[in-house]
UniProtKB/Swiss-Prot annotation:
Any GO BP annotation: dUTP catabolic process
Feature: compositional bias, Gly residues: 166-177
CDD domains with a match to the protein in the record: trimeric_dUTPase (cd07557)
Protein name: Deoxyuridine 5'-triphosphate nucleotidohydrolase
GO MF assignments: dUTP diphosphatase activity; magnesium ion binding
Positions that bind substrate: R83, S84, G85, N96, T100, I101, D102, K110
Record's compositionally biased regions (Polar residues): 150-163
Region listing for Disordered, in residue ranges: 150-177
Origin superkingdom: Bacteria
Gene: dut
Family: Belongs to the dUTPase family.
Keywords: Hydrolase, Magnesium, Metal-binding, Nucleotide metabolism
Record EC number: 3.6.1.23
Length: 177
């Protein structure tokens, strides 16, 4: 199947449902939504009390409530990601990116923000603070390879794997250019 065929076979009407429970402090903020037709992430808003704000000083972090509980389908996760505009203009980003909301989590979705900028940043009720991307999850069965045992054809013989150019190099071993 070509990329064009795959694109043509999907339509906006075939979107998966995301069931969301709105908590009392999230009332009036609206549901997460895509900013444009091609957006990958749904915008999340700060569910702070009316007339209250949080000031993030440079280097400070805070856990911001969204007022939402996601009921994800099994086999999916919600990834919490920063908004590029907040990062570029103010140095505001998510500390653990992407944050993962597992399908069996039933608590409020919260966003851990940090101010990496040079000035205080004020977060107010209803402000778009992050985005969430719903993604499929692949779980694996972890198996311990015993290097002293005879590997059968149903097992992977890692001893015959060729060396790679990367080898055991990590954390910057491939360079920056």
């Amino acid at each position: 199947m070509s990329l064009q065929d795959a694109h043509n076979s999907s339509s906006p009407s075939q979107k998966l449902p995301l069931w969301v429970q709105c908590l009392e402090h999230g009332q009036g903020l609206g549901l997460p939504h895509y900013a444009t037709e091609g957006s990958a992430g749904l915008d999340l808003r700060a569910a702070l009390p009316e007339n209250e704000s949080i000031t993030l000083s440079p280097g400070q972090r805070a856990l911001i409530p969204t007022g939402l509980i996601f009921h994800l389908s099994p086999g999916f996760e919600a990834q919490i990601r920063p908004r590029s505009g907040l990062a570029l203009k103010n140095g505001i980003t998510c500390l653990n990116t992407p944050g993962t909301i597992d399908s069996d989590y039933r608590g409020e979705v919260k966003v851990l923000l940090i101010n990496l900028g040079q000035e205080d940043f004020i977060i107010e009720r209803g402000m778009r603070i992050a985005q969430t991307v719903i993604a499929p999850v692949t779980q694996v069965e972890v198996r311990l390879l015993d290097p002293n045992s005879d590997l059968t054809s149903s097992q992977t013989d890692l001893s015959n794997q060729p060396n790679t150019g990367r080898g055991t190099g990590g954390f910057g071993s491939t360079g920056q250019k």
